[in-house]
Amino acid sequence: DGKRSDIVTVAWTGTICTNPPMLYISLRPSRYSYDIIKKSREFVINLTNEKLAKTADECGVKSGRDIDKWKVMKIEQLPSKVVAAPSVKESPVCIECKVENILELGSHHMFIAKVVAVNVDGKYMDEKNKFDLTKADMVVYNHGEYIGLSKVLGTFGYSVKKKKTRK
């Protein structure tokens, strides 16, 4: 709302459209950040790496009603390019979003949003200007565990690629 911001750890998120680029987050209405996002109609998804995993966990178990997470956890704010909501400076990728729709689904409400800007820390880009997951040490949350994603297992289509034959 321009006056307050919070950091909330979100387990339910994902891409829902490529063109236009859209994604979603799902939050319980009881969460402190819920009303902030509902009123401002914007948010930033700050992707988490191994360096931020403990901070992300702490942001998920402590409420912004009780503490200013930015100050207590010494997280540096980075002004976003398009939205008023700040980005996390330490995050390798910050995705700025504007809410298009809110679906009240039950325990969680889904914020469907258009991506309006993406900010990537240049040190994680490869020589082809592609984001390098193996350099960024990205983390996902799965059923109570934080799991590192620094290993490439294959490329698109590798399961059906024909093996080269020697002549």
Where are these regions (language model features)?
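Basic, polyanion-binding surface patches
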Residues: D1-K167
